[in-house]
Amino acid sequence: WIWQQYDHTVMGDTIQKPGGDAGVVRVHGTNKAVAASVDSSAVYCWAHPHTGGKQIVCESFRNLIAVGAKPIAITNCLNFGSPENEENMGEFVECVQGIGEASEYLKFPVVSGNVSFYNQTKDKGIKPTPTIGGVGLIMDYNKMITMDFKQIDNVILVIGKTEGHLDQTLFARNILDEKNGPPPEINLFNEKNNGETLLKLIQNDLIKSAHDVSLGGIITAIAKMCIKGKKGINLNKPKYLINEMEYFFGEDQGRYIVEVSKKDLKKVTDILDKNAVHFDELGTCLLYTSPSPRDRSI
């Protein structure tokens, strides 16, 4: 509701409006476009500030990749309680170190930012809340990708390995009422490798739609893509040792949902294999129908 109140079509150059992974605006007189995304995750940073700092940079990186943009740089807004409190200051230091580590590895530099301390009521500070704004470049905006499912019978893949991490997830905190445990681990090699491989696939016109997997896990990402595209999906869980709850609601990092045409599927999977990128096949797009409780169609 909030972002809908703002004018996001100034001069008619907006070619992907808010509500997707990133907003995209054309650059006058060229085929280029700039993508921008803003992300924050107080829950992960509260559970483990260093991992949370890395995660929010990676989330920004993935959001830009998912629209077909090469990530260029980030700015930050770091919101914390009183630095006079040792715990608050420790959270700040760990979070900044995590941001720096991810930025350096992903070649996604911090070029500006600000710090806001003393965010508290009486002596109780807010959760550590770093906010990252990322920008990326699309060399040809005709290759921009959106998240909505496009075509019936196209194949849906998950790029990236699913381990079934449930601690600190939306599902665990809001459905299971479990608020302890660490956030998902960040593997920076996989983040970079998965993202750069997907970007190559997008640039070679092999991907029809894409969306990163974040809060709510695979099931939430799939639901958004179905709703946006007014499509359904014949959803199947790969034969993993983890159970369905862990597979569909886990918030393991470095993952994307992508839509691929059947004629391009072999090309895509060969490229993923060649680059050592794990993937699972989830199912195929359907005409939208009301789901039956006896099946796993969405």
Positions of PLM-derived features:
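Short, acidic (Asp/Glu-rich) active-site segment that either coordinates a divalent metal cofactor
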Residues: 33-35, 68, 149-179
